[in-house]
Every structure is written in structure tokens, then in C-alpha cells.
Amino acid sequence: MNKKSVGQPPEGLHETKSLASALPEKNAEQRPKYVQIVALPSEIKSRELPIAPDNVVYFNGPTHYLSALYPCTVVVDGNEYNSVEHYYQACKLYVLTGEQSAAQLKASETPIEVKKATKNILKEAKIPAKKISAWKDKDSIAVLKHVIYHKFNQNDELKVKLLDTGDKILIQTYIGDTYFAAGANAKYTSTWVDRHVNQSLKYPENVVVDNVQYLPLVANGKNVLGWILMQVRDELRMRSSA
């Protein structure tokens, strides 16, 4: 069965005009207008998943078990965290502002609170946006893969739910993020899926900082969190069948 791969247009910066022009001006300004797309080299081991409405799982927000904001106890290196987001933000602060700042997050009970607290701490410490962005580019993927694996490996109910998604494409539908999410809401992303039925998404099997540039465009974003979840799913499946 031949399927045309999408999400790998000619290399370069690609403008997400179609969505931005349909949004209120305030929302359109909340995310980048361009997403970097680089063709996937043939020497990088890859996988391909068919695009179809029944082969996609959309997720967003603290009520969805796939979200980093979902309240869930995770133990990493002997330390307990209330969610993936708690660990992610703690790692960010540890590197950028030090151990004491990271420890302050223990007072933040919910993932939303921990995001706000981190933002305030970084602002008070006068950490420039460029430095925060550099941490994200260098460390965020490894941090997320590590904690997300622990999240599902330690919680049997969540692990079963993740494995039950089979080989479906997991897409974070958040309009304000074209890196970790699709840069679009569920309605728009669903329309994008409908337009690309009988095509496929080809992506690097191992999602690491060196090949994130090769991830295909999903709606208007890179959907990095979705691809990380799919890799964790593959790893858990392999361990379960071993």
C-alpha cells in the first residue's frame, strides 16, 4: 500500500498563515509564524504512520492522561513529583537558577501553579529569554523522555491506556505552541487530518535533540511531545513483550 508522506515539504522556514489568519489577532501573536522543516535523511532509522481520523488521539490540558499537566505522582531519582510538568520545571530551574530555586516548586501543588511559579522565579532572577530557549533546545527532550517513561512505567493504569492506543498518532492540540504541540486546536487539527487521509507521517524512530529538526509538520507544529509519547509507548511495549 503506497502512501504519500506529508509534513516533509522542501527545507526551510514554513509560514503557518492558514491558521493565524483565521484567529483573533491576540491569539495569532502568541505563537511563532514559522516552523523549521528539514528533510529526513535516509540514513536515519525512521517509522511511518498512516493518517486517518480513526488513527489519531488528540490531547490537551490537565484532564487528559497524556498531557504533561495531568496530575500524577512520579518518582525520579528518589524524589516525588506531582506531575511531568513539576519535574520538567524543576530541571529547568535547577540548571538556570540553582538547586534552591528548584526546591521552591515543592510549594506548588498543581501543574498550572508550578508553571506560574517557574515563570516568576526566572523573571526575578533576570534570566534572559535567550538562555531559557537555549536550555529548551538542549535539554528539554531528554528531560521529558526520562520523566514520561517513569510516569507510565510506574502507573499501571496509565500504562495500559497508553499501550491501548496501539500505533495511533498522538497529537497535542494547543494553539499556543508550535514546538511541543501542533500549534492548533483540536478542530483545526482534525480538519488537517481529514485533508491528509491516505497519506502518512514519516518520523525519526528515536526522538533526540539532534534529529528533532526532522520531525514532520503536524497541522502547524512539530508536535514534539506527541512524538516523545509515541517513542515511550514503543519502549514500554517492547519491555512488556520481552
From Swiss-Prot:
InterPro entries: NADAR (IPR012816), YbiA-like_sf (IPR037238). It holds the Pfam family NADAR. It comes from the Eukaryota. SUPFAM superfamilies: YbiA-like. Gene3D superfamilies: YbiA-like. Residues 1-27 are annotated as: Disordered. This is Uncharacterized protein F44E2.8. It comes from Caenorhabditis elegans.
